[in-house]
Regions:
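Soluble N-terminal domains of membrane-associated systems
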Residues: 1-77
Length: 77
């Protein structure tokens, strides 16, 4: 199927999720606004074709999921 983007498999989604969470954590630790962290993480998820990405950022933590309960992560910052 030319032109169609494949949805990443579960292992790849986990690796992508770790990458996006690390980026969000780095932004938050270096003083980025909460809105900017959420927005950046959502843009990154779209660029990796994660369809069901949800993120909630506080000043001291990040909560995110990528479609399933198995691919959910919380990070304290």
């Amino acid at each position: 199927m030319k032109g169609r983007e494949a949805y990443p498999d579960e292992e790849l989604r986990r690796r992508i999720m770790d990458f996006i969470m690390a980026a969000g954590q780095a932004l938050l630790e270096n003083g980025a606004e909460v809105f900017r962290v959420e927005q950046t993480m959502e843009i990154m998820a779209r660029s990796f074709h994660l369809r069901e990405f949800h993120v909630y950022v506080l000043t001291n933590g990040i909560f995110a999921s990528a479609g399933t309960a198995e691919i959910s992560e919380v990070r304290n910052v």
